[in-house]
Amino acid sequence: MLDAQTIATVKATIPLLVETGPKLTAHFYDRMFTHNPELKEIFNMSNQRNGDQREALFNAIAAYASNIENLPALLPAVEKIAQKHTSFQIKPEQYNIVGEHLLATLDEMFSPGQEVLDAWGKAYGVLANVFINREAEIYNENASKAGGWEGTRDFRIVAKTPRSALITSFELEPVDGGAVAEYRPGQYLGVWLKPEGFPHQEIRQYSLTRKPDGKGYRIAVKREEGGQVSNWLHNHANVGDVVKLVAPAGDFFMAVADDTPVTLISAGVGQTPMLAMLDTLAKAGHTAQVNWFHAAENGDVHAFADEVKELGQSLPRFTAHTWYRQPSEADRAKGQFDSEGLMDLSKLEGAFSDPTMQFYLCGPVGFMQFTAKQLVDLGVKQENIHYECFGPHKVL
């Protein structure tokens, strides 16, 4: 527990943090990667270049300082970050490195004096222990469950299937021939790669796209413009190649009773965790209403349409609606979409009028903000809306 003086000292720095903004975390990362370049093997350097990770860390630091007297308020964020950390295999000693560079950054940017540095040192130590303890629990859970493992495990690509002009799926089975751990629909795999020509090892998280089967995993990867890993997977990864995987993780998952209605809302590659949810519902013979609402640019980039249709046919109460923002003439001729333009949920209000319905969202942040606002305006409770951001987390 932190004493009152430490809490007061940390809270007194909040205006300075807010005024400085992500410049603080930019300095921190630059410093850390200069003194500890080995950490470039762990961090997603693409997120460093575009500034997303710096913004996310700044928001986390500011949130901690603001809630330092009410740590339970931070537990949802802690869980999200701890789950992600396990896919990077973060270890306790690395928290010491981060703490060292955080305090040095505060000193170099603000020269706040030893009292402030000591207070932040204590505060960081408390938070680091929360993460270390939770991550140890997750590591133990992953290692002890049937088919689970510690660290990384070699998997072989057994199938590579183009699903659209931009999305390709990969099926993976363990080289050792053993069973694989189950997971909750919506969770992701940590994929570790360092092909020839990569300056650093790259770690990415890809959503699992079907119900667990105990034998292997399936992910789907969108080719991102300028994306080092996604383009390598699309262009160079082949059936028979071996990649390293970390056990499934993630705090975004579906857990509903059979009589709970569900709406799955996605755009683009955001449908990948929804596919695992839909597959799980279909295989379980879910009896309550299930809605599948998906937005795509056009038919060329609309993946898994046939699979969704097939899964939906096995559900007794299923509604699907697809929006194409800019359909082609071929799309219109085929009639493979329902509405043109942006997703407008007001036209489908009757499909989710049940107040117990749970909503799961995934897609670009702007899309999720747009659809979440529509849901709230239509009377959906915030606590019934669950969402996942690909990349550093953002609040809708």
Curated annotation (Swiss-Prot):
Cofactor(s), by name: FAD; heme b
Assembly with partners or alone: Monomer.
Gene name, Swiss-Prot/TrEMBL: hmp
Residue numbers binding FAD: Y188, R204, Q205, Y206, S207, C389, F390, G391, P392
Keyword Cytoplasm included in the entry's annotation: yes
Record: residues binding NADP(+): G268, V269, G270, Q271, T272, P273
High-level lineage: Bacteria, Pseudomonadati, Pseudomonadota, Gammaproteobacteria, Enterobacterales
Organism listed in the record: Escherichia coli (strain K12)
GO molecular function: FAD binding; fatty acid binding; heme binding; hydroperoxide reductase activity; metal ion binding; nitric oxide dioxygenase NAD(P)H activity; oxygen binding; oxygen carrier activity
Annotated protein name in UniProt: Flavohemoprotein
Induction context: By nitric oxyde NO (under aerobic conditions), nitrite, nitrate (under anaerobic conditions), nitroso compounds, and paraquat.
Domain comment in the entry: Consists of two distinct domains; an N-terminal heme-containing oxygen-binding domain and a C-terminal reductase domain with binding sites for FAD and NAD(P)H.
Family to which the UniProt record says this protein belongs: Belongs to the globin family. Two-domain flavohemoproteins subfamily.
Free-text comment on the cofactor: Binds 1 FAD per subunit.
UniProt xrefs under InterPro entries: Cbr1-like_FAD-bd_dom (IPR008333), FAD-bd_FR_type (IPR017927), FNR_nucleotide-bd (IPR039261), Globin (IPR000971), Globin-like_sf (IPR009050), Globin/Proto (IPR012292), Hmp (IPR023950), OxRdtase_FAD/NAD-bd (IPR001433)
An example Gene Ontology CC term for this record: cytoplasm
Region (Reductase): 147-396
Domain annotation FAD-binding FR-type: ranges: 150-255
Site entry (Influences the redox potential of the prosthetic heme and FAD groups), positions: K84, E388
Record-annotated site: Involved in heme-bound ligand stabilization and O-O bond activation: Y29
